[in-house]
């Protein structure tokens, strides 16, 4: 499952709507269907009507599934389109199936949320959409300009977060609160013996010769943790407050750095 989140969508254009495209698929065969919340659609020049007050789901022509939570302006069409070819800029045309979320004209602080399920099956997708209305396998724990974070509850408890600035993410379920010193990507996964922390710095820090340089990111976890035996990466720093653990990680080349942590029973590093 890929969870897609967007926030702080804004535009001053009052004439043209701002849209988030879910898919735009060429209809290479006549009657190639898409499925819209259980309805198989094959007609051309058709705009599908969807109930915005409920969870909707889509299956595109390549069996990619989409589940869209309620309260969003979803539009789905099958139509003939004309466009400019990207190679020679000549006029071109074709039949396409398209789906998008409409944020309206001149939007301010709009957002979106949907999930993508590759290699999906219509029957299974329909069951999932129905079940997710009451019991989704994940929940969004933060969605704002500072961070996007999702807690996966099935099959494993895992917190996945994209931090756009230094910020603190409150504890989610059995997982501790997380504070980061710089923008980064963080995964915290619960294991029987403790936690696995993964951190990625998307900033390559290229020098004048376009060579990636290392950078340090400090992650603070609530609780008294220590790096488990056999883990070579990371350095634990103890704050004055024993209720928190700082872990300094050196990241480079956009690659993840992974650290295994166990509860520090003795209270010393």
PLM segments and residue spans:
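Terminal accessory/anchoring regions of large secretory-pathway or extracellular enzymes
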Residues: 1-269
